[in-house]
Amino acid sequence: MKIQLFFFILHFWVTILPAKKKYPEYGSLDLRRECRIGNGQCKNQCHENEIRIAYCIRPGTHCCLQQ
């Protein structure tokens, strides 16, 4: 079991960490900020006169744009 843990940590260290350093733009994306830049608001439910385009932070909230 210890050797499996060792190889898992080694695999993580060799593959995931260098990829995160090499491509930081693919790391974490702040969807709430992106929604605000697009003149949207993060809400639990969009009104009838709004368009839902994406999720904000968690799947329960939506980015709502006015038509």
Curated annotation (Swiss-Prot):
One of its GO terms (biological process) is cell chemotaxis. Keywords: Antibiotic, Antimicrobial, Defensin, Disulfide bond, Secreted, Signal. It is found in: Secreted. Residues 1-19 form the signal peptide. InterPro entries: Beta_defensin_dom. One of its GO terms (cellular component) is extracellular space. It holds the Pfam family Defensin_beta_2. Disulfide bonds join 35-63, 42-56, 46-64. One of its GO terms (molecular function) is chemoattractant activity. Belongs to the beta-defensin family. Has antibacterial activity. This is Beta-defensin 110.
